[in-house]
Each structure stands twice: as C-alpha cells, then as structure tokens.
Design a protein with these regions (language model features):
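Loop-to-transmembrane-helix entry motif
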Residues: 6, 33, 128-135, 162-169
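Residue-level recognition of specific faces of alpha-helices
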Residues: 5, 11, 121-125, 143, ...
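Transmembrane helix-loop junctions in multipass membrane proteins, especially transporters and channels
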Residues: 50-54, 80-84, 147-154, 184-192
Length: 200
C-alpha cells in the first residue's frame, strides 16, 4: 500500500504540474483534464465486487497494478511538446481503471487472515500505510525529480522533471506488483492447489 499510494500521489501532483506548467492549462481546465481517469475509475470500481467473486482479490489487485504501471510508464514519456490526448488522457484511462480495480482488493488484502479481535488494529495499520505512502512517496519523488537536467530551463525543464518523477513512480508500482505476485497471488494459488489435491 505504501508503494502504490506513493506512486499515485506522485501521479496527481506531477501531472498537475505538467498540465499547468508545461501545457499552460488554467486551474479549472486542469481539474477537468482529470475527468478521463475519474470516470473510468468510478465505472471500474462499481463492478469490483463482481470481479472479485470471479477472479479473487489477488488476481484483481495484480491486474489493477499492471494497468496503473502501464499508464504511468506511458505518461512518463510526455514531453514539453506532446499533446494532451495521446500523452495524458489515454494514460489516465489506464491509471483510472487500475486504481478502481486495485484499491478495494488492496484494503482487503491488508486485513485478510486477521483474527476478529485484531481487525481494528489491522485496519489502523492499513490507514497508517496509506498516509505514509502519501507523504514519504511524494517526498521521494520530489527529490528524484530535482536531480539532473542542469542544461534545461522553462517548460522543457519542468517536463523533464515530471517525466523523471513519473518514471520513479513506475518503478515503485513495478516493485509493488512483484510483492503482490510473490506474497498474495502465488501463495493463494498454492493453497488452492493443495485444497484441490485434498478433495481429490
């Protein structure tokens, strides 16, 4: 959760910087520019319960992280002279779908297997991880964005820094995906295989 939220808060922060500082969007237009992500996020989140019953939390979480990763990598390629539609809006669609698909399974996985008497404490840990991901993740990405590109200035410099930060955010998502596959998806597949063998 720390890695995922760190990458996502970086996405919101640096994409806003890109839209206002590079594409010269006003604040109101910048807010509207996030609509592709918001609408897809809402639509996907509405069908998460059905998807969870069909595919399980682990697979759904891995798929959501994969979509977010693909969108973040795509968005990180935006430069000072690329268009909103192909460099921002379409990656946002992937990120919105990934967020809508991942957030609920991410929370569920954080408290899965916890005894009923410890559910409150587990929920608290999940929320702490959420807040730490926001603050620490953004701090790391801002520090990474400030490195290099001494020869650039103006819009070109800002676009470079946004791209650098989003690339680092992509690395955080890739690491989160590896953790999910190793600690959530694979153990559940093994448990299902053992259960199937026992029933046979």
């Amino acid at each position: 959760r720390i890695l995922f939220l760190g990458a996502m808060i970086g996405f919101f922060f640096f994409t806003t910087q890109y839209l206002q500082g590079v594409l010269n969007y006003r604040a109101s237009l910048t807010g509207m520019a996030f609509l592709p992500m918001t609408m897809v996020n809402f639509a996907v989140a509405m069908v998460v319960p059905q998807l969870t019953r069909r595919f399980g939390n682990g697979r759904l979480l891995a798929c959501g992280l994969t979509l977010c990763l693909a969108g973040m990598v795509w968005l990180s390629r935006a430069t000072f002279d690329t268009s909103y539609l192909t460099s921002v809006a379409l990656p946002m669609v992937l990120i919105g779908a990934g967020q809508g698909m991942a957030l609920s399974p991410l929370t569920t996985s954080g408290i899965a297997g916890v005894a009923p008497q410890d559910a409150g404490a587990a929920s608290g840990v999940v929320n702490v991880a959420h807040q730490l991901g926001n603050s620490l993740g953004l701090g790391v990405l801002v520090a990474v964005a400030a490195v290099g590109a001494g020869a650039l200035d103006g819009r070109e410099l800002l676009a470079y820094r946004v791209g650098t930060a989003l690339t680092a955010g992509s690395a955080m998502l890739a690491f989160a995906l590896l953790i999910v596959c190793a600690l959530i998806v694979r153990p559940r597949k093994s448990a299902q295989a053992v259960a199937s063998g026992a029933n046979a």
